[in-house]
């Protein structure tokens, strides 16, 4: 069992989640070096903006 009590803190009498929560399904997201990822639904959020490549006026992300 993961030490789930480490994922929460009590502030002003309210329970606050320390980890990022998935906007799609509501479970905790795993924190990786360059992204946050939800193992339950597969949602991924990148920490840094990826550079955009412009070739002949067309933008590739």
Curated annotation (Swiss-Prot):
Any single Gene Ontology cellular-component annotation: ribosome
Gene3D superfamilies xref list: 6.20.50.180
Domain of life: Archaea
Pfam families noted in UniProt: Ribosomal_S27
Cofactor(s) this protein requires: Zn(2+)
A GO biological-process term: translation
Keywords: Metal-binding, Ribonucleoprotein, Ribosomal protein, Zinc, Zinc-finger
Cofactor note: Binds 1 zinc ion per subunit.
ZnF endpoints (C4-type): 22-41
Gene Ontology terms for molecular function: structural constituent of ribosome; zinc ion binding
Oligomer status and interactors: Part of the 30S ribosomal subunit.
Similarity section: Belongs to the eukaryotic ribosomal protein eS31 family.
Protein name: Small ribosomal subunit protein eS31
Annotated source species: Nanoarchaeum equitans (strain Kin4-M)
